[in-house]
Amino acid sequence: MRAGRALSNIAEQYRFHASIGGARLQRWLYLSIYYASWLVLRWGDRHTRALAVLRCLGMSDRRALLNLPDGLLLELDLYTSYDALYPIYEGRIYAPEPGFEPKSGWVVFDLGAQQGIFTCKAAKAVGTQGRVVAFEPHPSNFRLLKENVDRNELRNVTTVEAAVADRIGEADLYLHLHSTGYSLARKSTLGVVRVSLTTLDKTAEELGLQRVDLIKLDIEGSAIPALRGGERLLRRLKPKLAMEFESDRERRELPDWLRGLGYNVRVTAGYLYAD
């Protein structure tokens, strides 16, 4: 059963990447090496070990310009094109719950925008009457985010080079093996970058926003301080929330805290949806 599911997932990845134009050979080679490594390395965290093989081969950070079925043109590193593109575009994360898919006229906050996949997809969905505010603290990711927004002429996107927290200032951003999985919360030995911090409340005030319809969070274990730094916004505007749990603390604390703010919270397959 498990082997059948794994083979089905592999086939779906190849099918999806076959539907995308640009650097197809590079992407298929990346996928093939990843899955071959995953099958051979049968001890420890096989996912992380397979990624380590690709990093040692110098493939994870190679960039590819991709032509997506909806007309977006995105430049992504190969790791991001494998790890994030498929689940976001196939609706596997952030929008599988009814009512959480960005709609025309919505204002969307993208926390942990990385290289802009969700940001650009949401910007097309909300249209010229809507707006997307994208937060990304890591300098190289932010440059790609900006380039992708500009390349697609998405004038309804505001980019913010900062991590979202419960205070204004600076903090160390720790680098991890997962090419774009940088974290304020989880220390590592791979490196550190000093980044700016902002809050949801400050951003909403500075932009003069009277509505925020959806907040998507992918910030590697930092959701608690990020949401606490936006408590006024959450109480006043009640945006929908979609996030993946990244720590046991988030699983323990966030559902009850959000219910205390009047949210209806649903937890499914490691994801939290609140409205």
Language model features with spans:
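S-adenosyl-L-methionine
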Residues: 1-138, 143-144, 207, 271-275
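Conserved acidic-Pro-Pro-aromatic motif
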Residues: 106-107, 202-275
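Short alpha-helix adjacent to the SAM-binding motif of class I
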Residues: 140-151, 253
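Residues in the short beta-alpha loop(s) of Rossmann-like NAD(P)-binding domains
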Residues: 138, 148, 165, 247
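Hydrophobic pocket-lining residues within nucleotide cofactor-binding pockets
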Residues: 113, 164-166, 200, 219, ...
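Glycine-rich adenosyl-binding loop in Rossmann-like folds that engage adenosine-containing cofactors
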Residues: 72-100, 155, 160-209
